[in-house]
């Protein structure tokens, strides 16, 4: 698979502070790529360099196979965490202006705006001023001006900030639909549940360094702990616990009195899943048996606290 974006050994320093320490990333064409990290990790510095707001001290950015050039701004859609709409301008006037900055003719801009205003059901906002809109309403306008020029690469920094759950879900669906149509997406957020739902690749930056990068499924495999979540109905709990203790490590126990189901989290150690399952079957009725796959949140916390 080719890459829509390659970041090669990017180094950025502000005075004595190193914001990015020779960071390299590869964003596959057509992916939704989660850029993760705690506050101050270097994510925003990297995003600003990709958008040519600031320049790296060394290293280079490759967009769609060629070194990034100033005119490539037309191929990128960027929605920063700090939204940047002019509060005193009318919505329609501002959208037309920003669209033309991205290279669209006035006619094409109006066509795209009509499409998006209709799609998001905001037709009545055209003559309103930004200052008359709620934060969530202004967020919708910011999203529209970010995507209306049909960018190859969409960079979204905390895109769900300010949205209620209904509108957050609406924007999420629009991002997924744009991706299905071929737009590659870089998605920076602290909402780990959104990363789980949407991203197929992730990278984690911490203290100016890239610590993790890869397909989400592969990264999760790297962090597996060989633990299983099981549920069992047994009339001999004491015998079951003894049998399990001979070969496995119990890391969590939860007894559900409603149906007398015992829920366990068990680390296999050097044993196999079949050995665990056979041990359980001998002592009761197995109701649940599943490997515990780490969540993105688990991986994030483990990586930044080690």
Please tell me what each predicted stretch does.
Residues 1-5, 305-306:
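Short, Lys/Arg-enriched, disordered terminal segments
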Residues 4-5, 12-206, 212:
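ABC transporter nucleotide-binding domains
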Residues 64, 94, 103, 142, ...:
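A generic structural signal for secondary-structure junctions
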Residues 76-77, 117, 220, 297-301:
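Conserved protein kinase catalytic domain
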Residues 173-267:
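ABC transporter nucleotide-binding domain
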Residues 265-306:
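C-terminal coupling/interaction segments
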């Amino acid at each position: 698979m080719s890459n829509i974006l390659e970041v090669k050994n990017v180094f950025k320093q502000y005075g004595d502070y190193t914001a990015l320490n020779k960071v390299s990333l590869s964003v596959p064409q057509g992916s939704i790529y989660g850029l993760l990290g705690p506050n101050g990790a270097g994510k925003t510095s990297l995003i600003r360099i990709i958008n040519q707001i600031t320049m790296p001290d060394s290293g280079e950015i490759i967009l769609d196979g060629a070194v990034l050039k100033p005119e490539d701004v037309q191929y990128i859609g960027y929605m920063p965490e700090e939204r940047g709409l002019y509060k005193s301008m009318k919505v329609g006037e501002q959208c037309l202006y920003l669209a033309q900055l991205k290279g669209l003719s006035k006619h094409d801009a109006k066509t795209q705006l009509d499409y998006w205003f209709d799609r998001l059901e905001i037709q009545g906002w055209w003559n309103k001023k930004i200052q008359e809109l709620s934060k969530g309403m202004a967020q919708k306008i910011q999203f529209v001006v970010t995507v209306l020029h049909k960018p190859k690469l969409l960079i979204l920094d905390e895109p769900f900030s300010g949205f209620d759950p209904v509108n957050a879900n609406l924007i999420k669906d629009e991002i997924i639909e744009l991706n299905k149509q071929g737009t590659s997406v870089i998605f920076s957020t602290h909402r780990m549940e959104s990363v789980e739902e949407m991203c197929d690749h992730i990278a984690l930056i911490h203290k100016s360094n890239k610590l993790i990068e890869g397909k989400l499924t592969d990264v999760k495999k790297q962090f597996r702990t060989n633990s299983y979540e099981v549920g069992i109905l047994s009339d001999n709990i004491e015998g079951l616990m003894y049998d399990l203790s001979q070969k496995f490590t119990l890391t969590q126990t939860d007894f559900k009195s409603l149906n007398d189901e015992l829920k366990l989290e068990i680390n296999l150690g050097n044993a196999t899943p079949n050995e665990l399952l056979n041990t359980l079957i001998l002592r009761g009725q197995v109701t649940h048996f599943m490997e515990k796959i780490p969540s993105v949140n688990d991986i994030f916390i483990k990586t930044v606290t080690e």
